[in-house]
């Protein structure tokens, strides 16, 4: 039976490159000279540092631009609230989403069930596998998921015939 997987995974090689390019630009820009503005990547979290709120926002804008240039969807980013870390310095943690959470997976499963297509959707850890008898139904399901679940940067892989 034909099937495909619906996943939500960022290309971490490109994320790492974008963070490195952001750090390089922060080091060379005149308006960041003599400030504590910085960016670092640990595991699946990007940490932004700055002296003021507007500076933190500028660092985040640079990061988003670099990610966009590297074809990484910025919907993968989940920015937390800025925190004070001593003196006037601020820190902001930006989590990189990886995988579909159970609530979104159930939403995708319900969407496919309600579509009246002859398909089955199974939640497998952090992805949703959709199986069906006809390839056309699978393609219709892909279009339906793209249209209705716009807040997640979903991709489809492991397409089997």
From Swiss-Prot:
SUPFAM superfamilies the UniProt entry points to: YajQ-like (SSF89963)
Family of the protein in this entry: Belongs to the YajQ family.
Superkingdom of origin: Bacteria
Pfam families per UniProt: DUF520 (PF04461)
Lineage of the species this protein comes from: Bacteria, Pseudomonadati, Pseudomonadota, Betaproteobacteria, Burkholderiales
Source organism of the structure: Acidovorax sp. (strain JS42)
Record-linked InterPro entries: DUF520, UPF0234-like_C, UPF0234_N, YajQ-like_sf
Alphabetized GO MF terms: nucleotide binding
Record function comment: Nucleotide-binding protein.
Keywords, in A-Z order: Nucleotide-binding
Protein name: Nucleotide-binding protein Ajs_2750
NCBIfam families: PRK05412.1 (NF003819)
GO CC annotation terms, alphabetical: cytosol
């Amino acid at each position: 039976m034909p099937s495909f997987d619906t996943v939500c995974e960022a290309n971490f090689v490109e994320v790492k490159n974008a963070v490195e390019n952001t750090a390089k630009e922060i080091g060379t820009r005149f308006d960041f000279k003599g400030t504590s503005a910085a960016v670092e990547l640990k595991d699946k979290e990007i940490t932004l540092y700055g002296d003021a709120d507007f500076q933190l926002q500028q660092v985040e804008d640079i990061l988003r631009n670099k990610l966009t240039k590297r074809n990484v969807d910025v919907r993968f980013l989940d920015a937390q609230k800025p925190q004070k870390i001593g003196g006037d310095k601020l820190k902001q943690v930006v989590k990189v989403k990886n995988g579909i959470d159970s609530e979104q997976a159930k939403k995708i499963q319900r969407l496919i069930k309600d579509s009246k297509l002859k398909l089955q959707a199974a939640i497998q850890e952090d992805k949703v596998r959709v199986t069906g008898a006809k390839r056309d139904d699978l393609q219709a399901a892909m279009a339906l998921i793209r249209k209705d679940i716009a807040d997640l940067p979903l991709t489809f892989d492991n397409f089997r015939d």
